[in-house]
Structures are given as C-alpha cells and as structure tokens.
From Swiss-Prot:
One of its GO terms (biological process) is cell wall organization. One of its GO terms (molecular function) is metal ion binding. PROSITE patterns: MRAY_1 (PS01347), MRAY_2 (PS01348). Belongs to the glycosyltransferase 4 family. MraY subfamily. Its cofactor is Mg(2+). The gene is mraY. Pathway: Cell wall biogenesis; peptidoglycan biosynthesis. Its EC number is 2.7.8.13. It is found in: Cell inner membrane. This is Phospho-N-acetylmuramoyl-pentapeptide-transferase.
Length: 361
C-alpha cells in the first residue's frame, strides 16, 4: 500500500522513494523478518498448547529423531505466511496482477498444507488426506494461476517457453504451456515439501532460491536489463522482487526458531506454500527451466523418492538406504548438521549457476 504514496510525490517529494522496487524489496524483507521474530514466540506457544504431542515422528526414520524432535509443534508455516503477507500488502504495488496471482497460489497451497497438518496432528499419524485429492486441489489452483498469468502476459509472450543459455531457443507451446506451467508450480510445491525433513534444511534453500528469483524478476521486468541480457522482457514482473524479499525476511525470522534444535517445524503449511510461490514466480518470469537449476536440491530430493518407490515396486529393492535422500545420508552416518549445511552449500552453488544462465547466451 505504501507504493501508492509515490503518487503524492508532487506534494511531498520524499514519497518518490516508494516508486523504487529495490527500496520496497528491502522494506518488505525487514518488515517480514521483524514480524516473524516479534510474534514468533507467541505463535509457537499457541501451537504447542493446541497440538500437545506436536508433529508425529516417523518410527522407521533415524532413531535420533525420536529423541530430539518428538513433541515439537508443526504448522510454523503460519508465522511465515503471516509475515510474508503483511510485508507484501504493505510494500508491493496493489495494482500488480502478478503479485495477486502469487499471493493466491501461496494461500491456496498453504491452506491445503494446513489441512494436511491438522489431520496429521489430530490423528497422530503421518497420513493426511488422500494424496490424489491433494494433488488434484493443487493442480486446480495451479491451472487457474497459469491461465491468469497467460491472460495478463504481454501479447505474443503468454505461451512461450524459453531455454536458458540458448538465446534463440524459444518455443511456443500453445495451450500446452498451461499444463506445463501448472506442473512446474505443483512440482515445486511438493519438492519443497519433501525437502522439509531436517531442522533448517528447507527454509535456507528456499530463501536462496527466492533471492535468485528476486534478482531474475527485477531484471526481466526492466526493459533495459532484459534487452541487455537478451531475455524475454515481461512487464510487471519486477514487482515480484518485493514478494521474494518478503519471503526472505519471513524465512530469516522463521530460521531463528527453526535452527537446530528446532522449536517449531514449518509443516506442509509452509513447505507447500513456499514451493508454490517459487513455482509461480518462475512461471510468471518465464524462467521455468531455470527453476530446475536454482532449485536443483529440491529436484534431487523429490527424484530420490520417485526412484526409491519405482525401484521397490519394480524390483523389490531399494536404491537408497532411506528416502528422501537427506535421510539416506543420515543412515550412512552423517550428522544432521552436516547434511543440512552441505545441502545449503549445494543450494548456493546451484543458485549461482542459475544466475549465470542469464549472462551465458
């Protein structure tokens, strides 16, 4: 809402600062972080009181988890989403369609995750509601979002898929783009969800990816930078940098409480929502394939589960000691902090590689 003050810059010139995306991105980051840090203890206490035993811990998982994680409350995604939304509503341009599309996807996926968490906590079971039904709801939200993105895209840009590195490799997928882009959003949501299995493991790579796509959104939303980098200019997407800034701030605030030993888990409420947000930003900025690079850690995590399940069904043998792959390394003897920090390093390297694709043409 503060963006609207820029329209009064003729009356009070300092208000002109609210026109700048970089300024508002910083403001969103600070606001979201402060909100989560300030209200975090109260939210954690409330969730612990309401949940009692907290998130159920897998009996077949690493035995140390039964001792260190039992009784920890979940649904911490609520504090992330609250901080993110406050910052977005305060600092983003309320007239920007891409912002609203991203917010709707984030809230929709968050609501699905919340209901799943609720069932798990109340039943003290790892099974939420039907996986097929859950995927169906996610797909419905994603398709609606992609149709909206196509509707608000510049003429001739709606259904185009650009390949990184190759500047002339642009394919018009037609209406098939809707299904491809929806797959990206749903896949991103579930990949982050799968990754969220250790203290701090998911939130830091999410922030790294958000920082990367905040930069991408800013560049492709600026006609001068987009022309220089020879990437698709997508008017209006620069505003998504503010959303990414809010996510980083909320993530930093959450990490304060999620650092090992975690006081709270984000749960499906957070992981589905944040993954959906990243997927939507990638779709809106026309960098869907780059998300697979920047979010390569998430791809690795969900791929390990798919490979494990497929291998066991086809051959009766498991490829990994345990899936997702972060548990495989735990079973091999890596300590939890080793797994987490090494995966963070991978996320940083992949983010830099993703950014490099902007210049390598």
């Amino acid at each position: 809402m503060l963006y609207l003050l820029s329209e009064l810059s003729g009356v009070f010139s300092p208000f002109n600062v609210f026109r700048y995306i970089t300024f508002r991105t910083g403001g969103a980051l600070f606001t979201a972080g402060l909100f989560v840090f300030w209200f975090g203890p109260w939210i954690i206490s409330l969730l612990r009181l309401r949940q009692g035993k907290g998130q159920p811990i897998r009996e077949d998982g690493p035995q140390t988890h039964l001792l260190t994680k039992r009784g920890t409350p979940t649904m911490g995604g609520l504090m992330i989403l609250a901080g993110l939304l406050v910052a977005v509503f305060l600092w983003a341009n309320p007239r920007n369609s891409y912002v609203w599309i991203t917010v709707v996807v984030t809230l929709g996926f968050g609501a699905i995750g919340f209901y799943d968490d609720y069932l798990k906590v109340t039943k003290q079971s790892h099974k939420g509601f039907s996986g097929k039904f859950r995927l169906g709801l996610e797909a419905l939200i994603a398709v609606a979002a992609c149709v909206a993105v196509a509707e608000y895209s510049a003429p001739g840009l709606a259904y185009r898929l650009a390949f990184p590195v190759f500047k002339d490799a642009i394919v018009n997928l037609g209406l098939f783009w809707i299904f491809f882009a929806s797959f990206v959003i749903v896949g991103a949501g579930n990949a982050v969800n799968i990754t969220d299995g250790l203290d701090g493991l998911a939130i830091v790579p999410v922030m790294i990816a958000a920082a990367t796509f905040g930069i991408i959104a800013y560049l492709v939303g600026n006609v001068i930078y987009a022309s220089y980098l020879q990437v698709n200019y997508v008017p209006g997407t620069g505003e998504l940098a503010v959303v990414c800034g809010a996510l980083i701030g909320a993530g930093l605030g959450f990490l304060w409480f999620n650092a090992p030993p975690a006081q709270i888990f984000m749960g499906d409420t957070g992981s589905l929502a944040l993954g959906g947000l990243l997927g939507t930003v990638a779709v809106a900025t026309k960098h869907e394939i780059v998300l697979a690079v920047v979010g390569g850690l998430f791809v690795l995590e969900i791929a390990s589960v798919i490979i494990q399940v497929a291998s066991f069904k086809l051959t009766g043998k498991r490829v990994f000691r345990m899936a997702p792959i972060h548990h495989h390394f735990e079973q091999k003897g890596w300590k939890e902090p080793q797994v987490v920090i090494r995966f963070w390093i991978i996320a940083v390297v992949l983010a830099l590689l993703g950014l490099a694709t902007l210049k390598l043409r």
